[in-house]
């Protein structure tokens, strides 16, 4: 029976990374270890409630505002209502997800260049 060992050593040391890569990795760790992450799209709607006596039924009056987060899950579009109390936190979590995705894109490009044989451009 042949035994294989899995090395948990990093592919390269921190000192071998460019300053840009160290900064990107550091920010990614901050985002992952800090507050929440939420993947989806922020949607704000204006709608009437349907009551004839409500201000939203009057022409020219402001309608009711509601906020939702949409995302694809298992091939289906799902929506989640966001209350007024949750809006600031939810927006921040969506922003964290977007920032993390941008960081990953930049790291993927650095590593793509490394595999390609050239050193990554900073």
Regions found by a protein language model. Name each.
Residues 1-122:
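A positively charged, amphipathic N-terminal helix/segment that binds anionic biomolecules
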């Amino acid at each position: 029976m042949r035994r294989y060992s899995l090395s948990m050593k990093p592919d390269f040391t921190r000192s071998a990374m460019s300053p840009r890569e160290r900064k990107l990795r550091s920010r990614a760790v901050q985002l992952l270890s800090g507050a929440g992450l939420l993947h989806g799209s922020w949607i704000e709607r204006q709608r009437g409630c349907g009551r004839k006596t409500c201000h939203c039924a009057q022409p020219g009056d402001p309608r009711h505002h509601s906020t939702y987060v949409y995302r694809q899950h298992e091939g289906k579009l799902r929506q989640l209502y966001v209350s007024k109390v949750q809006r600031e936190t939810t927006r921040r979590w969506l922003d964290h997800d977007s920032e993390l995705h941008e960081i990953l894109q930049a790291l993927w490009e650095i590593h793509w260049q490394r595999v390609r044989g050239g050193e990554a451009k900073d």
